[in-house]
């Protein structure tokens, strides 16, 4: 006997860059590579590089990240369509993928495990609230003091270090901060001034400190040097919503 129930028709697939490369969070080291899928036409606009997706993998629905969209598949067989786009927010940049890949290779790890630790879990309410918030146009305050290297003038190589940052170079340096300095010349102020020089040169800055006490000091120094809402604090203490909001900013 033949069933009279018609089979559901498969989704039409997009024709523009129809092959997404997906890093699947399988947790298995022998599957530590990209997998190719197909993009249904209804997901074409949303399934962009950097977004979270759900994919069918070995009979299960697993999480993944789209890391690229390609015109042609490298896999010779039939491609499985993406199940859905979890969020249209691109949380994974090519630079972050490359860094996570380097960390995984360096320590014999799995890319999916590194990304799970590097990218905070999605918080839908925080994502929605940030999307509805008006954009903040914050500009750098005018520099104070005799010049951008004022706090660094006490260090023989300080002005040269800042100059190389301003010129787009990547100088390596170790700073032994002088003790007993006033706040405007203490090490948090030096870090904040170096960050400002890098930002003036159109670059990003990541400052890592060992504990919350140092975090508070650097936070105050950055507000003084850069103005409000020019940087974010990333810690585990505020909880998932605040951490995810800071990540998206």
Feature-to-residue mapping (PLM):
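Accessory, non-ATPase domains that flank or precede helicase/AAA+ motor cores in DNA-metabolism machines
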Residues: 1-249
């Amino acid at each position: 006997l033949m069933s009279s129930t018609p089979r559901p028709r498969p989704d039409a697939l997009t024709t523009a860059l129809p092959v997404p490369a997906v890093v699947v969070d399988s947790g298995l080291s022998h599957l530590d590579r990209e997998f190719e899928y197909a993009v249904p036409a209804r997901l074409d606009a949303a399934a962009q590089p950097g977004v979270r997706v759900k994919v069918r993998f070995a009979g299960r629905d697993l999480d993944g990240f789209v890391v690229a969209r390609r015109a042609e598949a490298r896999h010779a067989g039939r491609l499985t369509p993406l199940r859905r786009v979890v969020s249209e927010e691109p949380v994974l940049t090519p630079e972050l993928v490359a860094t996570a890949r380097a960390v995984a290779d360096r320590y014999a790890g799995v890319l999916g495990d590194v990304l799970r630790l590097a990218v905070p879990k999605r918080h839908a309410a925080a994502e929605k609230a940030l999307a509805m918030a008006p954009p903040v146009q914050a500009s750098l305050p005018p520099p104070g003091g005799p010049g951008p290297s004022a706090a660094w003038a006490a260090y023989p190589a300080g002005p040269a270090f800042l100059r190389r940052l301003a010129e787009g170079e990547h100088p390596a340096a170790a700073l032994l901060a002088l003790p007993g300095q006033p706040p405007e010349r203490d090490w948090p102020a030096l870090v904040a001034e170096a960050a400002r020089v890098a930002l003036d040169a159109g670059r990003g800055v990541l400052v890592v400190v060992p504990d919350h006490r140092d975090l508070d000091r650097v936070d105050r120094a950055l507000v003084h040097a850069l103005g409000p809402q020019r940087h974010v604090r990333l810690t585990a203490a505020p909880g998932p919503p605040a951490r995810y909001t800071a990540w998206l900013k």
